[in-house]
Amino acid sequence: MAKYIMALDAGTTSNRCILFNEKGEMCSVAQKEFTQFFPKPGWVEHDAEEIWATQLEVAKEAMANIQATAADICAIGITNQRETTIVWDKNTGEPVYHAIVWQCRRTAEYADSLKEKGLTETFRKKTGLVIDAYFSATKLKWLLDNVPGARERAERGELLFGTVETWLIWKLTQGQVHVTDYSNASRTMMFNINTLKWDDEILKELDIPKSMLPKPMPSSCVYGEVNPVYFGGPIPIAGAAGDQQAALFGQTCFRAGEAKNTYGTGCFLLMNTGEMPVSSKNGLVTTIAWGIDGKVVYALEGSIFVAGASIQWLRDEMKFIDSSTDSEYMARKVKDTNGCYVVPAFTGLGAPYWDQYARGTIVGLTRGVNKYHVIRATLESMAFQVNDVLEAMKADSGINLTSLKVDGGASANNLLMQMQADISNAPVNRPVCVETTAMGAAYLAGLAVGYWDSMDDIKRNWAIDRVFEPEIADDMREKKRKMWKKAVACAFNWAKDD
């Protein structure tokens, strides 16, 4: 059998390729950042062609690093930034506009208008989601309504829609395969998570032609083969999942009640709820975790829009640090935040608040607060936001989390992990391999082609690096949580016109 599984990890700020072996070890890694476009306040875009070019480049680089050929790759799994919306010409393959990124808030007013029509419950029951500009549906409608000629071309069947994995599969197969997986489809706000089909009533409400939508398929199956022109031979594309669902799978959270948090650009908590969707009454969304072996597994999810992005803000805009990795060292220069709280609501607040008009706030400033306090408070804001979601999950599921599995770039920050354990009053378990998003995509692809025999086979690969136990006193924890809630309230509705 071929030696490796290739995971293509199409992130929000960079694309990566990781080659994994049977033990789940990383054998080769390549990564490249791509351009972020901010044409107006609250707008975020990517160039879909640049996403494709960088993804292909890092895949070739990862193979070259260890002299791997197409014959050495058993299958490819793809994981991706979710909700980000791409529309392209079916014949030429040219995107009609930049990709509209999940963080983009340009459709906030249209999302409000859907709520005002009393459609909140309809969307929640069918899609599991709250109505928000975050999801793909309003972005797709905006493209059809605002790109000259787009609606007419879509009605004629000339345009295709896809989230990033759909776009990459289409490009890798040179336009032969137009599919999405259930986990990504469940993030579009157009997919019925009960019937596993695009919802005709929602498509009619949004005026979106069904012909442009990809075919929904399980997360672990062979979708097609990569055209040999790219890697010198055909390779099956056998797995796909949105980044957060892939991380849940990579963390081997296979049982109902198991949960993970990924610290990336945003923070994303998912709890496996088994084969029945659990409806949230506390600002979470119900989503599909994965479809595999004829079964669909559901999850509760809390999405925090700004996490690692707040460290980028400290680096790029505030110039407080030279690199993201400096944040821990700088934050340790002070013993606390000196009463300062940072609420990084740069693009609104996600779960459990869902306030798209909230904006970033720093409160508790005195003459004694310096940049180290602000850096520490920014780190702490991630832990507070995660705890807000954990509290909502507990309320919805009735399950008291005994521990939290963590991954993503910022999980390497020991100070942040200790803050998380302290604020959430639960042990934080960090695995040896924190690249669980890419690993999840690799596992899904490998299962489909028999590289791994079973999910039990995969579970044996998970190994712990470090456990962070809560250390602060209960009264201090309660005081900090109370002050955080007070700070968050200051951010609400800031950008809304009175």
Swiss-Prot record:
Residues the record lists as binding sn-glycerol 3-phosphate: T12, R82, E83, Y134, D243
Pathway assigned to this chain's UniProt record: Polyol metabolism; glycerol degradation via glycerol kinase pathway; sn-glycerol 3-phosphate from glycerol: step 1/1
InterPro entries (UniProt xref): ATPase_NBD, Carb_kinase_FGGY, Carb_kinase_FGGY_CS, FGGY_C, FGGY_N, Glycerol_kin
Gene Ontology BP terms: glycerol catabolic process; glycerol metabolic process; glycerol-3-phosphate metabolic process
Binding site for ATP: T12, T13, S14, T265, G308, Q312, G409
Signal peptide: none
Record function comment: Key enzyme in the regulation of glycerol uptake and metabolism. Catalyzes the phosphorylation of glycerol to yield sn-glycerol 3-phosphate.
Database matches in Pfam families: FGGY_C (PF02782), FGGY_N (PF00370)
GO MF: ATP binding; glycerol kinase activity
Gene: glpK
UniProt keyword Nucleotide-binding, yes or no: yes
Keyword Kinase: yes
Subunit structure: Homotetramer and homodimer (in equilibrium).
Residues annotated as binding ADP: T12, R16, T265, G308, G409, N413
Disulfides per UniProt: none
Entry protein name: Glycerol kinase
Assigned EC number: 2.7.1.30
Activity regulation info: Activated by phosphorylation and inhibited by fructose 1,6-bisphosphate (FBP).
Origin species: Agathobacter rectalis (strain ATCC 33656 / DSM 3377 / JCM 17463 / KCTC 5835 / VPI 0990)
Any single GO CC term annotated in Swiss-Prot or TrEMBL for this entry: cytosol
